[in-house]
Each structure stands twice: as structure tokens, then as C-alpha cells.
Regions:
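Contiguous, often N-terminal, cationic amphipathic patches that form binding interfaces
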Residues: 1-51, 58-61, 65-70, 75-111
């Protein structure tokens, strides 16, 4: 889910576009599940994903790069300048209690 990277870390995501609200909704096969209101048309959901993560992580969009999964629901993003622990500390407060435990469990596996 959250793995160290020489530039910071990577985050594996399972994205559900066209949802009622933008939210962290759970985990799925080792990925953090996100719902986005934007439909998956012309890359708009990918842009919305970067914007959502930038707001969540309090980073400029330029420091978040989609490195895998441009046309897939399973995506990997590189987050430049934040460690796995820093990302975890920013993501977990926005998740439900069950999701928090899953995120903690998954991130501990990859450290």
C-alpha cells in the first residue's frame, strides 16, 4: 500500500470514479480504496485523483505523479518528499476506524 521510494514513497490505490463523494473508503488487495466524484472520462478521474491526494497530503500537485495505471482502477502514485510514515500520518485521520487498522497493518508489512 505505502512503500518507500528513493524520492519519497509510493502509494497503491484502487480508485472508484463516479462516486457520490471523494473519500477514502477501505482497502482492496493491498491497495487503499478511494472514491472520486469525477467520471473516468478523458483522464479527468486521474486529474481528480492527483488533486484529492494533493489536498489530503498538503502538497503541490507537482509532487504527486501517477506512475502506473493510467487507464486502470488500480493505480500507483509516487509522492515526492514525504516518507511512508508521513503519508500514513496524513491518510489515517481521514479514514474510518476499520480502514485505519487496515492501512496500519498493510504499511507495516512494507517497511
Amino acid at each position: 500500500m505505502i512503500k518507500p521510494d528513493p524520492a519519497g514513497c509510493t502509494l497503491t490505490l484502487r480508485v472508484h470514479p463516479g462516486a457520490r463523494r471523494n473519500a477514502i473508503t477501505g482497502t482492496h488487495d493491498g491497495a487503499l480504496k478511494l472514491s472520486l466524484t469525477t467520471p473516468p472520462t478523458d483522464g479527468r478521474a486521474n486529474e481528480a485523483l492527483i488533486a484529492f491526494l494533493a489536498e489530503l497530503l498538503k502538497l503541490p500537485r507537482a509532487r504527486i505523479t501517477l506512475i502506473q495505471g493510467q487507464t486502470s482502477r488500480t493505480k500507483i502514485v509516487r509522492i515526492i518528499g514525504l516518507s511512508t510514515l508521513e503519508v500514513e500520518s496524513l491518510v489515517i485521520p481521514r479514514a474510518t476506524t476499520l480502514v485505519r487498522h487496515a492501512v496500519l497493518r498493510m504499511s507495516r508489512i512494507h517497511q
